[in-house]
């Protein structure tokens, strides 16, 4: 060992290295801090409307999950990221760190001095309630604080305590009979032992702190509006593949002085590609590339809406809008767009929100506000119950809104209330139905509301509240409106629309009933702009397949080859270019239009007709328990609400669920409030061999429908042969002969050799064309003009319409 000056040289080397590392760390820290500061300075101008950063989910559990809702949700999540997100949020909920505390309301309808102000003790009976609007029961937690909080959030003026556990809410005590105060001191509050919660048939009533219920009066527009014109941002939230109906809607609402902003669901690439073509032709139409999967009930819908607000303010040509109104692909105007424009101008500064139309307390329950939902794996999972803060007023109604610029800017700002509400509404079902209502009612904007969104919705809850279609995407049951048909379009007749007034209506679907759209169009547009005598005026189209966007299915390829062989063409198919469904009239059968490119580069277009293989009993025995069987249809992608199959080509594969629909007509022997169909037995067979059966109970349908669903893949295996499958429909009381029999085929990649025989039985090539010129003369062709929806040039100033 060498020692110099009493110091080991090895230690001197170590010390030198340590010193060098120290200065290196100091330099790196300085550089990082400087970089952060530079980025901060660059971002200051965008800070106000910047999209909030999404925090990373901690994958580590912080607690033991005991809530059954949370345990169920985590077990059903498919991705690790979703399971981790649900686990963390369930722990936050359990630990009390999930909810926010909110600032005091700045609405003029709120006064602190009224909080818990005692009104008195009143006689109360089950059949003669003082506070009639809503009732809660809190066996463990009832108290003044608990009751007030729940009545406050529903917007009521008064809350009342009774029988220990009962909490009542209402807005009127004018006709109440006051009794001795001692009658209201018979039961201790289970949630506060030093308080009393009323007596037997005795309710003690207090104020929440609301002054009056705000009900802005609707003012009809004057004929001449002296106020400066407004600019509206029309937000089109699009889904599906019926782009021709969207174009028709756009033509009906387009004015060059407004803005049109298009968001297409992230999963709908065909619609996106078609809308992008329009945006290229018309300068004040913009399609955003920032796309969300807007599932039913999901938080993503509100996030998308607010992202559009942020982004539109940064687009130079679009940034000066005054209002944002959102619409879907199934909306249509029922009064002239100029009248709508005039009314909005008359009420500048007001936002247009539709109320739920009934008791707020019931609305809160039906909307699932009391539960926490979490969106991941394209599903809304329910993970537990929530506690809302005492001072938050909740309200809601429709998610089709008209928001003034001031409220829109406030909603995306970093002020405390909107910032905390955005966070809270990430875990609320259908957030756009209540976010802006709640934000306005708890802020200075509560006086700037018109409680109407100027829309008419075709509600029929008996039919629209079918939960079957929602089971795959949400842990809840919700309602959707129905499509307008011949018997319901009277709802939007001119005088009814004016009296509300309502300027738009929904839902419309050209593949269900195009005549309803025609009625709305003729009512809202000048007839000089509508070519009612055009051959395709009654035609409805919906795209099924587009090359470069969709994956080709084996059954589609088989049909294309079959079509070429049927016309005795020697050409070989190279690719399917496009497939559309065509309905020539609202009562017509849906046909298939297929465009095929051959290996030589030639294009063929085919009109293809589907053959039905349904046999109804010829013995006349079609009546069961007073119901007469009228028709039997089958298909896949069944829509329970409208009772139609959205797989228009009629193919059934081993991956599908087969849906068989019976249509019944009641005789005079059926009582008025009975179901619309009898009990029926379905039997499934492979040739003569019975393979399954099911009993279907009586059903209640406004269309007289009754259904059975049969999972093909789970019931059948080894589908490499060419069997014929049958569904027999029997009356349970008579199984000797079926009421009806339908035949269907199952197309797989393993039984391709069977496809030609199947196609020969189930399809007919009705017509075809082989050139652009020839196809342009076929009214069924994709190339034939369709002026009601074509947008090929842009704005025609002279005709004042998109062409």
Swiss-Prot record:
Catalytic reaction equation(s):
UDP-alpha-D-xylose + L-seryl-[protein] = 3-O-(beta-D-xylosyl)-L-seryl-[protein] + UDP + H(+)
Q: Which domain of life is it from?
A: Eukaryota
User: Which residues does the record give as UDP-alpha-D-xylose binding sites?
Assistant: 265, 294-296, 399-400, 480, 506-507
Instruction: Respond yes or no to whether keyword Zinc is given for this record.
Output: no
> Where does this polypeptide localize?
Endoplasmic reticulum membrane; Golgi apparatus membrane
Q: Name one GO cellular component term.
A: Golgi membrane
Q: Name the top EC class.
A: transferase
What are its cofactors?
Answer: a divalent metal cation
Q: Which residues are glycosylated?
A: 95, 175, 224, 326, 615, 718
Pathway noted in the entry: Glycan metabolism; chondroitin sulfate biosynthesis; Glycan metabolism; heparan sulfate biosynthesis
* Keywords (A to Z) from UniProt: Disulfide bond, Endoplasmic reticulum, Glycoprotein, Glycosyltransferase, Golgi apparatus, Membrane, Metal-binding, Signal-anchor, Transferase, Transmembrane, Transmembrane helix
Q: List the disulfide bonds.
A: 63-91, 107-446, 465-479, 467-477, 769-775
Membrane spanning residue stretches: 14-34
Q: Which residues lie on this side of the membrane: Lumenal?
A: 35-803
Which BP terms from GO are recorded? chondroitin sulfate proteoglycan biosynthetic process; heparan sulfate proteoglycan biosynthetic process
Membrane topology type: Single-pass type II membrane protein
Protein function: Catalyzes the first step in biosynthesis of glycosaminoglycan. Transfers D-xylose from UDP-D-xylose to specific serine residues of the core protein.
| Family of the protein in this entry | Belongs to the glycosyltransferase 14 family. XylT subfamily.
* Protein name listed in UniProt: Xylosyltransferase sqv-6
Where does this protein come from, organism-wise? Caenorhabditis briggsae
């Amino acid at each position: 060992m060498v020692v110099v000056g009493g110091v080991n040289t090895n230690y001197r080397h170590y010390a030198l290295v340590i010193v060098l590392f120290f200065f290196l760390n100091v330099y790196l820290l300085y550089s990082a801090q400087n970089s952060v500061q530079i980025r901060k300075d660059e971002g200051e101008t965008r800070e106000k409307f910047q999209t909030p950063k999404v925090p990373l989910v901690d994958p580590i559990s912080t607690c033991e999950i005991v809530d059954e809702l949370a345990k169920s949700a985590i077990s059903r999540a498919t991705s690790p990221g979703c399971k981790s997100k649900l686990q963390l949020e369930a722990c936050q909920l359990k630990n009390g760190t999930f909810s926010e505390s909110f600032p005091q309301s700045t609405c003029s309808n709120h006064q602190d001095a009224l909080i818990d102000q005692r009104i008195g003790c009143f006689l109360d009976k089950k059949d003669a309630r003082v506070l009639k609007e809503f009732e809660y029961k809190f066996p463990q937690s009832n108290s003044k604080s608990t009751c007030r909080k729940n009545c406050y959030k529903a917007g009521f003026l008064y809350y009342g305590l009774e029988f220990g556990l009962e909490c009542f809410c209402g807005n009127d005590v004018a006709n109440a009979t006051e009794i001795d105060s001692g009658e209201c001191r018979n039961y201790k509050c289970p949630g506060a032992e030093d308080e009393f919660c009323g007596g037997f048939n005795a309710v003690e009533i207090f104020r929440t702190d609301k002054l009056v219920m705000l009900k802005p009066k609707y003012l009809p527009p004057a004929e001449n509006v002296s106020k400066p014109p407004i600019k509206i941002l029309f937000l089109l939230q699009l889904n599906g593949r019926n782009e021709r109906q969207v174009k028709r809607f756009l033509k009906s609402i387009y004015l060059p002085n407004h803005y049109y902003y298009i968001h297409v669901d992230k999963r709908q690439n065909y619609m996106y590609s078609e809308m992008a073509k329009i945006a290229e032709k018309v300068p004040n139409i913009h399609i955003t590339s920032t796309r969300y999967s807007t599932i039913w009930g999901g938080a993503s819908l509100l996030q998308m809406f607010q992202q559009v607000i942020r982004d539109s303010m940064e687009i130079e040509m679009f940034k000066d809008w005054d209002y944002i109104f959102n619409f879907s692909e199934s909306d249509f105007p029922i009064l002239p767009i100029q009248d709508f424009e005039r009314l909005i101008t008359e009420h500048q500064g007001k936002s247009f929100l539709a109320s739920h139309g009934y008791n707020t307390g019931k609305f809160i329950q039906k909307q699932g506000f009391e539960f926490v939902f979490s969106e991941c794996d394209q599903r809304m999972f329910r993970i537990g119950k929530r506690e809302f803060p005492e001072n938050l007023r909740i309200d809601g109604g429709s998610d089709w809104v008209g928001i003034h610029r001031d409220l829109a800017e406030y909603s995306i700002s970093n002020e405390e209330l909107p910032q905390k509400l955005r966070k809270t509404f990430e875990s609320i079902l259908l957030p756009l139905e209540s976010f802006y209502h709640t934000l306005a009612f708890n802020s200075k904007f509560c006086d700037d509301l018109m409680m109407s969104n100027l829309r008419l919705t075709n509600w029929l809850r008996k039919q629209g509240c079918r939960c079957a279609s929602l089971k795959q995407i949400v842990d809840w049951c919700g309602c959707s409106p129905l499509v307008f048909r011949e018997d319901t379009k009277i709802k939007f007749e001119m005088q009814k629309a004016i009296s509300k007034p309502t300027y738009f209506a929904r839902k419309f679907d050209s593949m269900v009933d195009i005549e309803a759209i025609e009625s709305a169009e003729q009512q809202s547009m000048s007839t000089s702009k509508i070519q009612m005598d055009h051959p395709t005026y009654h035609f409805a189209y919906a795209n099924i397949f587009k090359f470069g966007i969709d994956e080709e299915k084996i059954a589609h390829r088989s049909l294309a080859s079959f079509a070429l062989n049927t016309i005795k063409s020697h050409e070989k198919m190279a690719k399917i270019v496009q497939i559309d469904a065509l309905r020539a009239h609202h009562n017509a059968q849906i046909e298939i239009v297929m465009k095929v490119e051959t290996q030589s580069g030639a294009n063929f277009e085919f009109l293809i007709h589907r053959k039905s293989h349904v046999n109804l009993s010829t013995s006349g025995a079609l009546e069961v328990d007073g119901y007469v069987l009228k028709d039997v249809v089958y298909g896949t992608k069944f829509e329970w609400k409208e009772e139609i199959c959205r797989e228009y080509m009629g193919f059934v594969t081993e991956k599908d669920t087969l849906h068989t629909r019976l249509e019944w007509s009641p005789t005079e022997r059926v009582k008025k409030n009975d179901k619309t169909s009898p009990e029926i037995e379905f039997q499934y067979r492979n040739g003569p061999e019975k393979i399954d059966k099911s009993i279907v109970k009586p059903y209640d349908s406004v269309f007289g429908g009754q259904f059975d669903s049969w999972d093909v893949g789970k019931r059948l295996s080894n589908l490499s042969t060419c069997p014929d499958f049958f569904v027999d429909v029997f009356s349970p009381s008579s199984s000797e002969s079926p009421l009806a029999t339908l035949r269907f085929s199952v197309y797989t990649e393993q039984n391709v050799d069977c496809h030609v025989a199947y196609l020969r039985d189930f399809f007919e090539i009705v017509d075809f064309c082989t050139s652009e010129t020839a196809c342009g003369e076929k009214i069924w062709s994709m190339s034939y003009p369709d002026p009601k929806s074509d947008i090929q040039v842009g704005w025609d100033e002279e005709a004042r319409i998109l062409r």
